[in-house]
Structures are given as structure tokens and as C-alpha cells.
Amino acid sequence: MAAAEKPVLSRYRDRMDKAVSALKEEFGSLRTGRASASLLDQVMVEAYGSTTPLNAVASVSVPEPRQINVSVWDRGVVVSVEKAIRASGLGLNPVVEGQNLRIPIPPLTEERRRDLQKIAGKYAEQQKIAVRNVRRDANDDLKKAEKDGAIAEDERKKMETEVQKMTDDAIKRIDEALKTKEHEIMQV
């Protein structure tokens, strides 16, 4: 019976891993004072009658630590790309040079660094909640399986302990990622 239930636990482990991965993606979009192509991943551009991701209309490169270059493929979309970057809330001011946009990354102020730390903390807390929700779902499913007679009580308790270990591990990885990101944000 235990072998039949193991895939259930691996399914929950996968969901917890996805929460940690999602956090790392969200952290990639936080500006740290260093140029990063992922900084513009969330930018959406009004082009061709619809809203499109920036990477669908241009290529993004990082030639220097404090500069991002955006090469727009269609000259008619350059103004839309510039507007989208300015409106993104990242505090960036692109300089248009033909079909290219040069985006200098200004150093962050102390106040902005503190704000970014708070935002990173919120992202981490959202993913911790997601992990705890997965734990709750797993425990509910285990109790249901016990009630239906698929597993014994001692097996359920053993599996709940395993689910708790998976939860603790995922939350530990989230905390480590947050600590790393906060350190990165505060470096001048």
C-alpha cells in the first residue's frame, strides 16, 4: 500500500518546488541596482493591436553592469516599447537611438532599497502561504484516504510527518532565497 501512496507525496513535493521556483522568478523582476535582462520580463507592450510581452517584439541584452540594451525588431513599435518601460514602475528612463533603446540603471537610494526589501518579503510570504496550503491539501487527502480505508492510521501519521518535513524544507529554501535577495538589494 505504501508504494501506491508515494506518488501522492511526490505530487505535493512538486507543488512545493513550484512555489520556490515561482519565488525565484518574482525575485528576478526586482531591480537591485545591477542590470539584468530578467528585469524587463514583466514589461508588456501595446503592439499590433494587443498587449504583448517585451521579449516578443525586441531582444534584451546587458552590455555593461549598469546598462540594458533593447533592440526592437520593428521600427513602428519603438515608441510603444519606450512608453511601456517608462510605465513599468521600475524607475527606468530609456534613451531611444534608432531602433535601439539604451537603458541606464541608476543606483538605488537607501529608501528604495528598503522598499524593495519589503516587496521581496511580501513575495516570500505569499509563497510560504502557498506551501502551507499544499501541506493542508496533502493532510486532508491523507485523512480522507484513511477514512476510506486505503491506508492505516499509523501509515497516515508517518506520511503526515513526511509532508511536514517537505514543508519545512520548502520554507527553509524560501527563507534562504529571501536572505540572499535582501543581501543583493542592500549591496551598494
Swiss-Prot record:
Instruction: Name the family.
Output: Belongs to the RRF family.
- Which Gene Ontology MF annotations are present? ribosomal large subunit binding
Function description:
Responsible for the release of ribosomes from messenger RNA at the termination of protein biosynthesis. May increase the efficiency of translation by recycling ribosomes from one round of translation to another.
**Keyword Cytoplasm applies:** yes
Record localization:
Cytoplasm
What SUPFAM superfamilies does its record include?
A: Ribosome recycling factor, RRF
The protein here is known as: Ribosome-recycling factor
Encoding gene per record: frr
A GO BP term here is: cytoplasmic translational termination
Q: What Pfam family is a match for this entry?
A: RRF
Its Gene Ontology cellular component terms are: cytosol
NCBIfam families xref list = frr
Q: Name the UniProt key words of this record, in alphabetical order.
A: Cytoplasm, Protein biosynthesis
